[in-house]
């Protein structure tokens, strides 16, 4: 069963989000992070962001969580306010 790591951030301005978007497009996930997909949602007026990382296995999730939890604050979109693990119960793309 796939798993999702859902992270909320505050203090994410438009400029920082544009910078993160550029870094994600040009780079690779951090070493040890084996995601199948990353979705980033941004509310520029509230300066909040929600990041959803999808993992195929529990081991991939565990390793990714360890790496991402240890990241320096400057490598994240803003101030991390929560991290929650979810089972991916259903998924559809069109």
Q: Predicted regions span which residues?
A:
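Short S/T/G/P-rich N-terminal loop/turn motif that feeds into the first structured element of a domain
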Residues: 1-50, 56-70, 76-94
């Amino acid at each position: 069963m796939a798993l999702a790591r859902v992270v909320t951030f505050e203090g994410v301005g438009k400029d920082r989000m544009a910078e993160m978007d550029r870094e994600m497009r040009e780079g690779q996930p951090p070493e040890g992070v084996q995601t199948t997909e990353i979705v980033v949602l941004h509310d520029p007026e509230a300066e909040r962001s929600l990041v959803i990382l999808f993992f195929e296995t529990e081991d991939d999730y565990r390793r990714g969580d360890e790496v991402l939890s240890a990241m320096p604050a400057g490598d994240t979109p803003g101030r991390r306010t929560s991290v929650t693990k979810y089972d991916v119960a259903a998924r559809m793309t069109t």
